[in-house]
Amino acid sequence: MKVINFKNEPKNNPFSPEWNYFMCETQTKDINFKKLAKYLLDKEKKILKLPISKDINNKHTDGYTKVGFNSTTSRFQNFNVMNFKNTEIIKLKQNIIDAHNLFLKAVGAPSPNHLYIQCWYNVLRKGQEIKLHLHGVHPNIYLGGHVCVQADDTSTFYINTPNQINEPSSYQSKNEVGKLTLFQNFIAHYTNKNNSKSERITIAFDLSPVKLSDNYIRII
């Protein structure tokens, strides 16, 4: 596991900026991603029949990704990948649990009594991209995650929030099949454009020690 730390330089006075964010990258094990990619694409039409997600103002939302409403992304509130009856998904769930536990140990964070997950998937076709967005800043925000199922020369960029005006800085995470990324869920992120004829398929999720909505299911 590779741990990435966005951290300020030592402060020289009480008013200089400070930050200390963590994320990590690791490789999943024992998952057939070719089978999983086909399964998710075959399921796409069914997912698109679900209601579109809604924001706090009760308006349709794609999670601020700008992927649009004709997408699985925009149904993120109304299905949970972890409920799919699929062997590769079962193995993926265990990989997520293992990565979560290892990450907490690596950064010295306490383990929660319970862990809940909201999980969806994104399909980007040629010319599409996910715009800059974040998953939340409320007091219960915890960890977000991302698993690359299928990709061809794309990346996800995680921004260092305090430094985005004069000299914007970000961490580029290349989308490699099987890579699992965990990050503090208030870290804003985006992708570059998919220029390939093949779909960029990723599974994304929110983790929480508490059940934030009916769409969250308990995994620990």
Model feature map: region roles:
Residues M1-G108:
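Non-heme Fe(II)/2-oxoglutarate
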Residues K2-N8, K211-I220:
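A short, highly charged, low-complexity intrinsically disordered segment
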Residues S53, N195-S198, I220:
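Flexible domain-boundary/linker segments
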Residues E88-K91, N194-R200:
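Short, surface-exposed loop and linker segments with low hydrophobicity and enrichment for Pro/Ser/Thr
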Residues G108-I187, N192, E199-T202, V210-I217:
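Catalytic core of non-heme Fe(II) oxygenases with the double-stranded beta-helix
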